[in-house]
Regions:
Chain A
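N-terminal capping/small domains of soluble enzymes
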Residues: 1-64
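Active-site mouth loops of central-metabolism enzymes
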Residues: 8-24, 64-79, 101-107, 128-141, ...
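Glycine-rich, proline-tolerant flexible connector loops at the mouths of alpha/beta enzymes
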Residues: 31-51, 67-74, 94-112, 158-167
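Short, well-ordered coil/turn segments that N-cap beta-strands
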Residues: 38-40, 59-63, 90-92, 123-127, ...
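Catalytic cores of alpha/beta
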Residues: 53, 74-85, 136-147, 170, ...
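Glycine-rich phosphate-binding active-site loops on the catalytic face of alpha/beta enzymes
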Residues: 65-70, 88-103, 150-165, 187-229
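Conserved anion-binding
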Residues: 83, 93-154
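Flavin-dependent oxidoreductase catalytic cores
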Residues: 214, 218-276
Length: 276, 589
């Protein structure tokens, strides 16, 4: 059985609108939905931070702004400036993107300093570090989590939603094991329905970045009337990042890493029939 | 009485007697309106199943508490016993007619008897007038609507039949607002059997709202949710329902040539994308609807509405036809003549396979777009081969000795999703109270689109419970009355909230689900009295015994029986599909 009530679920949600083409009307809608459902926060691009903060004033819904989004490949000072400005404009939380290239190059000091620069610039705001797990091996995900904590972040986060793929339970589980219970884990990217959200919560996510927030909350309502459908045994491959490895979107070494894992997986023989 | 106009009129066309039918608040709470209240009220005059063309068979036009509000609802339901299936049937239509009926001060009409000469009903200021329709008889639906508007009011909304309904074609539709159809189940034939050509409604009475402030907030919130949802805010608006053509084809379950294959090589040419590039003139919307899934289209010589997904398939892949112009013009003809496009296409597919097997010698050939219009027209007038086509696929296939070639459930043609590609959809078809219908439980949402939960489409596990849930939610939405597309954006908790702000009555989520279950069970009880049982909760043998050979649903067949056992257990029915006494007691039936 799923032991989760609506109140708990809505307080785990960062209601998100980060599209390049989103104008003020969409941000207004985002804020109004967040207010009426009581979501924890809205997550927006920096240019919308002040507007969202104004619209949500007094509602109890926080504003989360992104920094270095979505590539994470800018300079540390640029990221820090972006974060500081967002906090001045009313952001209570900052979701920054890790420097993925530096992490893969094993420039650990650089990565830690990059995170620390943003954490210090963010002052009282809570900082989450987006690892963009679709570009990383398990070892690199573990390394990214440790560097995030060392750099002063309070949360690690799976994905931007613009990378190779979104949040998978396997990655969330790994991140939770690495950071322990005191640090938050945010799952984000491609979470479309309540079952997907629930899987990630079970894997250890304490926050969800969602565009489909309303449908997911409604899904919880439906679940109680037909629990079997939501509790149906999973086909492991359907929720495995290895099955979603994509040479067009991932570095070839990362693609090869996931493919190798897939070929060595004990589930392969049983479930491969689904992909004949 | 917020949400309702407080008047349901029963009229006997034979005696011209009319009376107001009292409906208690308790009954409205238990059945809402629309489909649920229609089925409930049908059982009063017709407790025992009678011939659909018997004058005593009731034909009910029913709105719901949300009809005529700005909650995307100009809809109404037509309820009667179907001449196509023999089941209880309700058929839903959009446009503005439902809102106009309430604007005229009436929640619903219960029509019995048969007029000696053709008549139409004019509903204005809470009164129902019987008018002579001799001059309208024989006109198509477009001309009928214009002629009635000329007599009543240019602002009147008209629901009417065309030649197909007059000729009692078993799948004749009721058409309103030019091209909107209460298409399925032959409600137009029942109307024609009563010599009732049209019902016109006009008036400006407003639906009272119990909580105006809450309603205003909720409307604004709903608009935002609909706009943000990728289905209601994007796909349906830009590409219409035909956005599904490429999606379903890619899943290998786009029925091709009477369901013999699941992949149509020319699907792209009949897709929503292609319609937008070639025929689309503008998108169109029902009363107060922010979605606007309708397609107003134009060929070189004609203009009309559609094709929507089911029609693009019925006259397209199902017949091996990829000529989009021919498909659109066949759609226009069905609208004008008053025919259900799904059954028309399904029956033609059956005819083509009968011809190919040598069972019927008439010249039906796959891909023959040039004769499509002739076949449709002949069907409406029951002439030539049309006399047989007008029977629908089940009777046609039986007549020619190959009943297994009719792709139908309980006599109604299965629409555009091959059940071998989605086991839950298979169960939904088999257990549908009105026959082969995708709208009773749209399992494509969880099995293909991942809403509200993504399910393994080839698995039978857990499907029964979700099919029953979807059937119950759909009964609620059809009874409220709302557009079904809203289910992509919001769920049962929001429906309860909408009903509360409009009617002032509280429904918990649990109570609302019980309303849906009660309605579904009441329909089932009627069908059992009409002789339906487990043997009728079945699929054509093709889906059980033959595997698809190509595409991503290949090597699949339907595992129906275990799902059926699960389903009956979930429903509280016995092994024969009869509701147990305890179930009836729980539902107050």
């Amino acid at each position: 059985m799923i032991d989760l009530d609506r109140e708990t679920l809505v307080k785990m949600i960062d209601h998100t609108e980060l599209s390049a083409h989103s104008g003020e009307k969409k941000i207004a809608n985002l804020c109004d939905e967040a207010r009426s459902f009581g979501f924890y926060a809205v997550c927006v691009n920096g240019a919308h931070t002040a507007y969202a903060a104004g619209r949500l004033a007094g509602s109890g819904v926080l504003v989360c702004a992104v920094a270095g989004f979505p590539l994470g490949a800018g300079t540390s000072s640029a990221k820090a400036f972006e974060a500081a400005e967002a906090v001045r404009n009313g952001a209570s939380e900052i979701d920054m993107v890790i420097n993925v290239g530096a992490l893969r190059d094993k420039k650990f000091d650089f990565v830690r300093d990059d995170i620390r620069a943003v954490a210090e610039a963010s002052g009282p705001a809570l900082v989450k570090v987006i690892l963009e797990t679709g570009y990383l091996t398990d070892e690199e995900i573990v390394g990214g989590c440790k560097l995030s904590v060392e750099g002063g972040a309070q949360f690690v986060k799976t994905s931007t939603g613009f990378g190779a793929f979104g949040a998978f339970p396997e990655h969330v589980r790994l991140m939770r094991q690495t950071v322990g219970p005191a640090i938050g884990v945010k799952a984000a990217g491609g979470i479309k329905n309540f079952k997907e959200a629930w899987r990630l919560i079970l894997a250890g996510a304490s926050r969800l970045g969602l565009s489909a927030s309303v449908g997911i909350v409604e899904g919880l309502s439906l679940y109680k009337f037909a629990p079997a459908a939501w509790l149906e045994e999973e086909i492991p491959c359907h929720i495995c990042p290895s099955r979603f490895a994509n040479l067009d979107k991932q570095p070839k070494a990362v693609y090869a890493y996931y493919k190798k894992k897939c070929l060595a997986c004990p589930h392969l023989e049983k479930y491969n029939k689904y992909y004949e | 009485m917020s949400g309702w106009m407080g008047k349901i009129v029963a009229i006997d066309l034979g005696s011209r007697e009319r009376r107001t039918v009292a409906v208690s608040e308790e009954t409205r709470r238990r059945f809402l309106g629309g489909r649920g209240l229609g089925v409930r009220l049908y059982n009063d005059p017709c407790p025992d199943p009678i011939d659909p063309f018997d004058p005593d068979n009731a034909l009910i036009f029913m709105t719901g508490p949300l009809t005529g509000t700005t909650m995307t609802s100009g809809r109404y339901q037509v309820v009667s016993r179907s001449p196509l299936t023999g089941t209880i049937c309700d058929s839903s239509s959009g446009g503005t007619f439902g809102a106009a009926l309430k604007g005229a001060g009436v929640d619903g009409l219960i029509v019995r008897g048969r007029a000696e000469r053709p008549v139409y009903l004019a509903v204005q200021d809470g009164e129902v007038e019987v008018r002579d329709a001799a001059a309208l008889w024989g006109l198509d639906t477009q001309k009928t609507q214009k002629a009635v508007q000329a007599e009543i009011s240019s602002k009147a909304s008209v629901a009417c039949i065309g030649p197909a309904g007059e000729n009692r074609v078993l799948f004749a539709a009721v058409m309103n607002d030019k091209d909107r159809a209460a298409g399925r189940g032959g409600m137009g034939a029942v109307m024609g059997g009563k010599n009732l050509k049209a019902v016109a409604a006009s008036g400006n009475r407003a639906v009272a709202i119990a909580d105006p402030a809450g309603y205003k907030d909720l409307t604004a919130r709903l608009d935002r949710i609909v706009d943000k949802n990728p289905v209601t805010g994007k796909s349906l608006q830009v590409l219409g329902t035909s956005v599904l053509v490429n999606i379903i084809n890619a899943h290998g379950m786009f029925p091709t040539e009477n369901f013999r294959r699941g992949v149509f090589n020319d699907a792209e040419g009949t897709s929503g994308e292609k319609i937008a590039e070639t025929l689309l003139e503008r998108q169109s919307a029902c009363y107060k609807c922010p979605i606007g899934c309708g397609r107003t289209t134009r060929t070189r010589t004609k203009r009309g509405e559609g094709p929507e997904y089911e029609t693009a398939w019925a006259f397209g892949a199902n017949l091996g036809i990829s000529d989009l112009t021919a498909i659109a013009e066949a759609n226009y003809a069905c609208n004008e003549l008053g025919l259900d496009t799904i059954t028309m296409g399904g029956t033609l597919g059956c005819a083509m396979e009968l011809r190919e097997t040598g069972a019927w010698k008439e010249n039906f050939r796959w891909g023959e777009a040039g004769r499509l219009l002739d076949w449709v027209t002949d069907t409406a007038y029951r002439r030539g081969v049309g006399a047989d086509l007008a029977l629908g696929s089940k009777r046609l296939a039986v007549k020619h000795g190959r009943p297994e070639l009719a792709m139908q459930v309980k006599g109604m043609e299965i629409p555009a999703y091959d059940p071998r590609g989605a086991q839950g959809m298979a169960l939904s078809y088999a257990t549908s109270n009105r026959g082969g219908c995708h709208m009773r439980a749209y399992m494509i949402a969880p099995e293909i689109l991942g809403h509200p939960v993504f399910l393994d489409r080839f698995s039978t596990a857990g499907k029964a419970e979700l099919v029953a849930l979807f059937q119950d939610v759909s009964a609620v939405v059809d009874s409220a009355v709302l557009c079904r597309f809203l289910q992509f954006a919001v769920g049962i908790s929001t429906f309860a909230e909408i009903l509360r702000t409009v009617t002032g009555l509280d429904w918990s989520e649990e109570e609302l689900m019980r309303v849906g279950r009660r309605i579904y069970t009441l329909e089932r009880l009627f069908n059992i009295r009409a002789g339906f049982g487990r043997a009728d909760d079945a699929l054509p043998p093709r889906f059980l015994n033959e595997e698809l050979q190509t595409g991503s649903s290949r090597r699949r067949r339907v595992g129906l029986e275990p799902m059926l056992d699960d389903y009956y257990a979930v429903r509280g029915w016995d092994r024969n599909g009869v509701p147990r006494p305890q179930t009836l007691a729980e539902l107050g039936l």
